[in-house]
Amino acid sequence: MQFKNVFIVLYLLLVVFIYGCGQKNTTIALTGKTYYFSNSGNDSGAGTQALPFKTINKLNTLRLAAGDTVYFNGDQTFNGSVFIDSINAAETRPIVITSYNNGSAIINSGDSNAITLYKCSYIKIVNIHVVGAGRKTGNIKDGIVINTCNNITIDSIDVSGFQKAGLFVYASGIVEINNVKAHDNGFAGISVSGDYGKYNCYNIHINNCSAENNPGDPANLTNHSGNGIIAGYCKNIIIENSTATNNGWDMPRTGNGPVGIWCYEADSVIIQRCISYANKTSAGGGDGGGFDLDGGVTNTVIQYCLSYQNQGSGFGIFQYAGAGNWHDNVVRFNISEEDGAVSPAKAGIFIWNSSRDTNQFKNCLFYNNVIYNSQVAAISYDKESEHTGFKFYNNIFTANNELLKGKPGKDVFMGNDWYSLQTTFNADGILNFNAWANTYNQEKLNSKIVGLNVKPPFNNEGNANVTLPSQLNTFTNYQLLLNDSLAYKGLDLYMLFGIKNGGKAFNQNQAPPKGLGACF
């Protein structure tokens, strides 16, 4: 396909899909029933607030209908597993499961799932705290499972203590996930997946969520675990205003590892205004990075995100053997600080392709990003990294010494600023920027060198400490000092190549046509 970079249009379409796709009006009764549950209740009672039910077992016997609401008494613990099977409500009268009185009710499911929705529609789970027995102390399941459902809302949920994912959305569509705190789980905080080889998980919106301290699945000895937010075999996904931190540190194996926020075998994903920091991997393990566009990802964008102090690279660009083709993805207006010093990549950006087929790994636009690393390199190419159509424009690359590791092949670098903290410039053993540009025909437009080798006058580099996406708009550490001309020495990507930059910079200010770096 032609690379037209129409991601603003894509974003608007995805929002329409997520909030409106598949909806239909249904005529139902004007009112539903209410059911109350309290530790002081009795399952033989009426289920009213005055005479509440007591146990989850009672809830599982109810045949809920459109408009019904289930209330659990806040700050009380209810033992067991909620299972709702094949119940369909309606757009205007959803079924709601929530808390009443002060605080959130706690569902303690021990070694099993806490809440499972199977083949259901129009159900909302709001203001509930779910806990398992712990990823190493008895639990072997996911926390909340949305299985083959549509039009589901998960809002204001705290989920912890599950060996697999805190929240698992499987083969479902039109799911709104908001304000979920997923922590102290095994495989992942939040996991979204369709069936293998299918994209039958679709129109998922993850907003204002956090995935923290999900260390790894002790039972998974063959693949990665300890992810923050992960999406695969899916399409039309938005992950925004969310955070992943301190995940992956107890993955029980070496080999491919976890990442803070990432997707694989996915089409039309937008990851934006997110923070991924201090994520880890096992000793000797791979990955442990901030963000990742992995095998089989297509038509996807990462924008306005901050990655810092991850053991793995801030941005992984990966294709693995056996995945669908990887193509037409964009990484723009992001910042990586001090990433990749522990994992084998040793760089802020890591590019890898185990398929060794350039036709399977092509067309990436990487522009207006800042990669700052006082410890290791800016970009690393694995010895297996064959690809085509990768273009890097208007970025600022700052590294400890070596700026580039490995061989970039036929990648295009144009309009970037390069700076080595130790040697001013070092790429492929060449210590002179102009000599490197002429040797490899890089950073040239119409035979003229358009790249730069200037120390960027950042405001407060190397000191990121923001932890909330709401703080990103005022994060000025990598905004070039006021009135510095370097900020406007990039290329006009629209005039030259027809690339629309989306109109916004990292900090949501207007992105100038010739802007260099991420913040303005």
Where are these regions (language model features)?
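Extracellular beta-strand/beta-solenoid scaffold signature
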Residues: 81-85, 109-116, 137-145, 161-170, ...
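Surface beta-loop-beta hairpin patches that serve as ligand-binding interfaces in beta-rich domains
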Residues: 430-520
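Right-handed parallel beta-helix
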Residues: 94, 98-103, 121-132, 150-161, ...
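Bacterial Sec-dependent N-terminal signal peptides
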Residues: 17-31
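Bacterial N-terminal signal peptides that target proteins for export
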Residues: 1-8
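Acidic Gly/Asp/Thr-rich repetitive segments characteristic of extracellular carbohydrate-active
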Residues: 34-73, 77-79, 83, 111-114, ...
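Extracellular beta-strand-rich solenoid/capping regions of secreted or surface-exposed proteins
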Residues: 57, 62-66, 77-96, 105-152, ...
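Bacterial N-terminal signal peptides
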Residues: 9-17
